[in-house]
């Protein structure tokens, strides 16, 4: 599906037509530049690769510099592929936030905030051991039993335990588009989207 790369600016709120205060996320969507056009004959599938945010040549590897020079564009910091654009695009074309003028809902892909090593209560919503009497101590937020004894004599794969939380690729579907501001490349989306302020997100129609 067609889309754009963008940067999460932060959250604010706007008033709807009936006077309700609606929380929304402000995203700087594009402008993105077409850096490669893939075809079924050459690449096995049809897609358009776009780049977002300029970066210096000295921070770009030589293979990527050749890739950008072939497209006739300046080096880009972030690249992503999209399919099924309605209009035919050429190398070097610019795609702006006006792509979403007729979109009522979008999907947003981002990287969730990293929270470090967390226990089972925060990471998986466990209730803890529960009782703090009958000899229990220092067990309020522990997972409890993680398996049987002599059989199967192991912990099964996939057992929910403490570990690294956050920093995952998260997709939020069907978020309502509240407003498109082309002159500032801004997109206002109802509710929250994954990631922290300044993080890169993918917006798909």
UniProtKB/Swiss-Prot annotation:
GO CC annotation terms, alphabetical: cytosolic large ribosomal subunit
One protein family per Pfam: Ribosomal_L3
Record function comment: One of the primary rRNA binding proteins, it binds directly near the 3'-end of the 23S rRNA, where it nucleates assembly of the 50S subunit.
Keywords per UniProt: Ribonucleoprotein, Ribosomal protein, RNA-binding, rRNA-binding
Keyword Ribosomal protein: yes
The name this protein goes by in its record: Large ribosomal subunit protein uL3
Domain of life per record: Bacteria
Record InterPro entries: Ribosomal_uL3, Ribosomal_uL3_bac/org-type, Ribosomal_uL3_CS, Transl_B-barrel_sf
Keyword Cell division: no
Family: Belongs to the universal ribosomal protein uL3 family.
UniProt GO MF annotations: rRNA binding; structural constituent of ribosome
GO biological-process terms attached to the record: translation
Assembly information from the UniProt record: Part of the 50S ribosomal subunit. Forms a cluster with proteins L14 and L19.
Species per Swiss-Prot/TrEMBL record: Phocaeicola vulgatus (strain ATCC 8482 / DSM 1447 / JCM 5826 / CCUG 4940 / NBRC 14291 / NCTC 11154)
């Amino acid at each position: 599906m067609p889309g754009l790369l963008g940067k999460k600016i932060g959250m604010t709120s706007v008033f709807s037509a009936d006077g309700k205060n609606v929380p929304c996320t402000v995203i700087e969507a594009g402008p993105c530049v077409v850096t490669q056009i893939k075809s079924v004959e050459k690449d096995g599938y049809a897609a358009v690769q776009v780049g977002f945010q300029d970066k210096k040549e000295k921070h770009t590897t030589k293979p990527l510099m050749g890739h950008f020079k072939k497209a006739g564009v300046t080096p880009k910091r972030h690249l992503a592929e999209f399919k099924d654009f309605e209009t035919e695009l050429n190398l070097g074309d610019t795609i702006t936030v006006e792509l979403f003028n007729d979109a009522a809902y979008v999907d947003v892909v981002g990287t969730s905030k990293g929270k470090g090593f967390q226990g089972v209560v925060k990471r998986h919503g466990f209730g803890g051991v529960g009782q703090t009497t009958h000899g229990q101590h220092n067990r309020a937020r522990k997972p409890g039993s993680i398996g049987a004894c002599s059989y199967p004599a192991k912990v099964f794969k996939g057992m929910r335990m403490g570990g690294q939380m956050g920093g995952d690729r998260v997709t939020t579907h069907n978020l309502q588009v509240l407003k498109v501001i082309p002159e500032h490349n801004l997109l206002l989306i109802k509710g929250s989207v994954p990631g922290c302020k300044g993080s890169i997100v993918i917006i798909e129609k």
